[in-house]
């Protein structure tokens, strides 16, 4: 089975590693590297991992105009984890199955920054959801959920680490 993986932050790295151990990851798509200081760029965590694993890496500003390039990999499955961009339906339709690993217990905290919003709202529990992707954001069939306790000392980074394992 050939997979295209889309992700950007540390949260997504263990997911990419696990997929790479069991399947053929044809392409990794991550957000473009951003400037840390003037003229200096740092790889996104997923980009750094993809490079270290010797995987094909693509970092477009947006993916919507890269349909033909993505299609050329002839992958069966798309897996996303904190990619940071909406994936157009035209691209979703290239795959037999599209899965998203989302950093909340859906349907709560759909969309971006779910971990940060859980902390801001004083939640004691959050989690991760594996779901089917549809054209509506974070609204597909949910296949699995795992809870995670939020302690008073937890930062967003701590929770990212707990959820990405």
Language-model features: locations:
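Short, structured coil segments at secondary-structure junctions
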Residues: 21-22, 53, 94-95
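Short amphipathic alpha-helix with an adjacent loop that forms part of the alpha/beta core around
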Residues: 64-74
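N-terminal beta-loop-helix "entrance" segment that forms/cooperates
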Residues: 34-53
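N-terminal Rossmann-like dinucleotide-binding module
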Residues: 1-39
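Catalytic cores of RNA-modifying enzymes
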Residues: 1, 48-53, 71, 77
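Hydrophobic beta-strand scaffold residues
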Residues: 25, 56-57, 98, 126
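Short beta->alpha connector loops
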Residues: 8-11, 61-64, 83-85
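Donor/substrate-binding cores of folate-linked one-carbon enzymes
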Residues: 77-165
């Amino acid at each position: 089975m050939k997979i295209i993986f889309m992700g950007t932050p540390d949260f997504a790295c263990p997911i990419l590693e696990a997929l790479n151990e069991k399947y053929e990851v044809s392409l990794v798509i991550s957000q473009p590297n951003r400037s840390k200081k003037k003229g200096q760029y740092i790889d996104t965590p997923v980009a750094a991992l993809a490079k270290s694993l010797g995987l094909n890496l693509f970092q477009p500003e947006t993916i919507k105009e890269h349909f033909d390039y993505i299609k050329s990999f002839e992958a069966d499955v798309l897996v996303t984890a904190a990619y940071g961009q909406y994936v157009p339906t035209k691209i979703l339709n290239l795959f037999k199955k599209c899965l998203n690993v989302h950093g909340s217990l859906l349907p709560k905290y759909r969309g971006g920054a779910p971990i940060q919003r859980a902390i801001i709202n004083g939640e004691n529990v959050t989690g991760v959801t594996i779901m089917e992707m549809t054209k509506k954001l974070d609204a597909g069939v949910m296949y699995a959920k795992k809870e995670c306790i939020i302690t008073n000392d937890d930062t967003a980074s701590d929770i990212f680490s707990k959820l990405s394992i």
